Amino acid sequence: MEKSEATVKTSIARFGIVLLVLFLSAPALAGTRDDCITKCKEAGNFIKTQGISAAIKEINNKNGRFVWNDGVSYVFLMNMKARMLAHPHKPELLKPATLIDATDVDGKAFFREFVVKAEKGKGWSKYMWPVPGMEITKPKHTFIYRVPDTDYFVGAGFYVMKPGVFY
């Protein structure tokens, strides 16, 4: 009977730890989500006030205002035909006329999903993507924001490194 009580207490303690980790990570996730939304809206405003050429230059800048979190978080710019116009870490994405049919390692056509979200004005998308500066692919949550009255949208996201750890 004592062993059974110890097992129950251990299980309760483990459950408590899991709840604590989830509780403590919620503000970090909220901050990360909020940062992505804020940066996308700032980029949209930059496009509207400074023009598309200046925005492409600034968004492509690895050390610019639209790259943060040690370079892991960044804004990218696309048009409604799924053509990448600016990306600070993957200039090779600028070459194709469209990325509409490109997929992640799991076969998800996430660029197509980006366009659908942009058609609605905004939205979140989840897919697998390489982490900048690392040789790993992790789940990424990206906020898509259509720049009002244009054929452009921007995106910014964060990676889920492991349960409760967002980057």
Where are these regions (language model features)?
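N-terminal signal peptide c-region/cleavage motif recognized by signal peptidases
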Residues: 25-26
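N-terminal membrane-sensor/transducer module of prokaryotic signaling receptors
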Residues: 2-9, 17, 29-167
